[in-house]
């Protein structure tokens, strides 16, 4: 297996921390064990066989190299697998184990420092993080597109959509109710702990959990879309959209769930969705909790807007600004973060 030479480059402390995370096998185990994710990429590549036959592919953030292997199986003649972490050494072994050394070249480099000797016909990348934008890998894909992708070349996936919906969270409800139940268990009244528990649970940190379809309180709204063929670096640094919901019925509103879908190009296009209405993925859903739960009724209107942007402290981390109004009431604002 040939390892392409790379020029020296500087990495930020945040980049080093990010790439080090991907040297841990558990990260790759979780991703590859996610059959919804992995099969979507495999199927999308195979369905683009006619477009990839004899072509050159760039795999951005190749990890273990599985997408590079899929690309060759789909007919690619040459694949450049760019991986900045030490996992690149294992990607070489994966490629060799599948007898693809003559077609897949692994480059241990960030994509911004990679030296790729030719233009490519397609780019494949699994760049999505929690709430789509956590870890901020999409700018690297755009960089690769602008530098190496031939005019009219393929990007897999080619578009992304973000969704939001109001939700009830039974786990949060149960945890808050627990403190009112302690007296019945031990004869000690600890209901005063409930407000403290609420401030700890419903804080400014985004949570990643599964949401049951029955806990979604209104039809979801798509609040942002990206066309990866044309979107700019500036556009992906500040994703913004508005929402308006009409609640299905009487319930406690604990917050909002955010999820995404990505779609691959082709006549028989493949969509990978992280919706609570679909099969479970390792991304689950991202939850934005209010400061306290609010009672809503049938047809209660909820309006507002949401903005996703990189953290000022660490651009790999995510910041979400939420503005909302419930039942025509006071407009409230809450800022969330993901990452320390």
Swiss-Prot record:
Q: Which PROSITE patterns does the record cross-reference, listed alphabetically?
A: SAM_MT_PRMT
Catalytically driven reaction(s)? L-arginyl-[protein] + 2 S-adenosyl-L-methionine = N(omega),N(omega)-dimethyl-L-arginyl-[protein] + 2 S-adenosyl-L-homocysteine + 2 H(+)
Q: Which GO terms describe its cellular component?
A: nucleus
- Cite the entry's keywords alphabetically: Chromatin regulator, DNA damage, DNA repair, Methylation, Methyltransferase, Nucleus, Repressor, S-adenosyl-L-methionine, Transcription, Transcription regulation, Transferase
Q: Which PANTHER family match?
A: PROTEIN ARGININE N-METHYLTRANSFERASE (PTHR11006), PROTEIN ARGININE N-METHYLTRANSFERASE 6 (PTHR11006:SF73)
What family is it from?
Belongs to the class I-like SAM-binding methyltransferase superfamily. Protein arginine N-methyltransferase family. PRMT6 subfamily.
Explain the purpose of this protein.
Arginine methyltransferase that can catalyze the formation of both omega-N monomethylarginine (MMA) and asymmetrical dimethylarginine (aDMA), with a strong preference for the formation of aDMA. Preferentially methylates arginyl residues present in a glycine and arginine-rich domain and displays preference for monomethylated substrates. Specifically mediates the asymmetric dimethylation of histone H3 'Arg-2' to form H3R2me2a. H3R2me2a represents a specific tag for epigenetic transcriptional repression and is mutually exclusive with methylation on histone H3 'Lys-4' (H3K4me2 and H3K4me3).
In Swiss-Prot or TrEMBL terms, this protein is called Protein arginine N-methyltransferase 6
Q: Which organism is it from?
A: Xenopus tropicalis (Western clawed frog)
Query: Per UniProt, what is the name of the gene that codes for the protein in this document?
Result: prmt6
């Amino acid at each position: 297996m040939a390892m392409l030479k790379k020029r020296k480059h500087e990495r930020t402390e945040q980049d080093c921390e990010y790439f080090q995370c991907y040297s841990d096998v558990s990260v790759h185990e979780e991703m590859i064990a996610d059959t919804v994710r992995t099969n979507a990429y495999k199927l999308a590549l195979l369905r683009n066989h006619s477009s990839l036959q004899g072509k050159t592919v760039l795999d951005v953030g190749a990890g273990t190299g599985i997408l590079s292997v899929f690309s060759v199986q789909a007919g690619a003649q040459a694949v450049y697998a760019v991986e900045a972490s030490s996992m690149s050494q294992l990607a070489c072994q994966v490629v060799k184990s599948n007898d693809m050394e003559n077609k897949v070249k692994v480059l241990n480099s960030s994509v911004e420092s990679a030296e790729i000797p030719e233009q490519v016909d397609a780019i494949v990348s699994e760049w999505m993080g929690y709430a789509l934008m956590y870890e901020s890998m999409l700018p690297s894909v755009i960089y690769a597109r602008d530098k190496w992708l031939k005019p009219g070349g393929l990007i897999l996936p080619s578009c992304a959509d973000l969704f939001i919906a109001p939700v009830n969270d039974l786990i949060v409800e149960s945890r808050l109710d627990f403190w009112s139940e302690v007296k019945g268990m031990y004869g000690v009244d600890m209901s005063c702990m409930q407000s403290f528990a609420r401030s700890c649970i419903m804080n400014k940190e985004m949570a990643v959990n599964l949401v049951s379809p029955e806990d979604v309180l209104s039809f979801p709204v798509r609040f942002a879309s990206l066309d990866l063929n044309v979107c700019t670096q500036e556009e992906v640094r500040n994703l913004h959209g508005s929402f308006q919901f009409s609640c299905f019925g009487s319930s406690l509103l604990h917050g909002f769930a955010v999820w995404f879908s990505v779609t691959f190009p082709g006549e028989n296009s493949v969509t990978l969705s992280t919706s609570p209405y679909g099969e479970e993925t390792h991304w689950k859903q991202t939850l934005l909790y209010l400061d306290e739960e609010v009672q809503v009724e049938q047809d209660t209107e909820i309006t507002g807007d949401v903005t996703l942007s990189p953290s000022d402290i660490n651009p790999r981390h995510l910041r979400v600004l939420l503005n909302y109004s419930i039942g025509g009431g006071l407009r409230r604002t809450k800022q969330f973060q993901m990452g320390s």
